């Protein structure tokens, strides 16, 4: 992959609070070794230094290695409860536990981005989207629903960029273009739908920042990797122009491209 693309990924997916050191091998169990940066404060609350805590995350399953209720993750546990028809409304402590799990997967997916393991990063982003959906459907408190939903633009940015870069590695430029175009559009629409919620928190910048990040990746890939225009974008432009002949031509072209035909 182009070095400029790697540099942008490093910029977007490095959290200075969690510094990846490399891999550790524990009797054949490879883990991600990192340092957590913890600020040291004086009695008056002034920063006086930093403490580096050595941590390790498992590469598979829940990053901290815990198995809540004997399942691979809380998401797996609640999905099992749903399957059995036994999931009650999620109390505030349940929602807090789900948010804590989402934080573990957020940290690890950043590491996967830094390592160039884009499909693993995508899977961890999808895990957190699953947690978000769970809270949206079953949290008893509306505040708990929004506490995760507000981060949807961030998680979708990560999922889409990871999926796009994984497709790029397979030289599937159309999928790369489609992932980025759809994400940029859907994040912008989400921000419009929830404009009042973000305004109450003075957090409108979250949405615009995530949109700009996806756009930056797409622009760089167009410059460095000859990324084509997304089929959906071409079709929407034809629809806006009310050009029936062009719409039909593009529809047939999209079908050929997405089916892999010449």
Which residues does each predicted region cover?
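N-terminal cationic and glycine-rich segments that engage phosphates or anionic surfaces
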Residues: 181, 206-230, 236, 240-243
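TPR-adjacent "capping" and linker segments in tetratricopeptide-repeat scaffold/adaptor proteins
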Residues: 81, 85-102, 144-156, 216-228
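Short, charge-rich amphipathic alpha-helical segments embedded
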Residues: 118, 122-149, 183-201, 249-262
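N-terminal alpha-helical interaction modules that lie
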Residues: 1-136, 171-190
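Alpha-helical solenoid repeat scaffolds
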Residues: 78, 104-107, 111-114, 144, ...
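Amphipathic alpha-helical repeat scaffolds of TPR domains
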Residues: 97-114, 126-129, 133, 150-169, ...
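Hydrophobic side-chain positions on well-ordered alpha-helices
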Residues: 112, 166-167, 234, 238-241
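Solenoid-repeat scaffolds in large eukaryotic assemblies
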Residues: 121, 128, 173-179, 229-231, ...
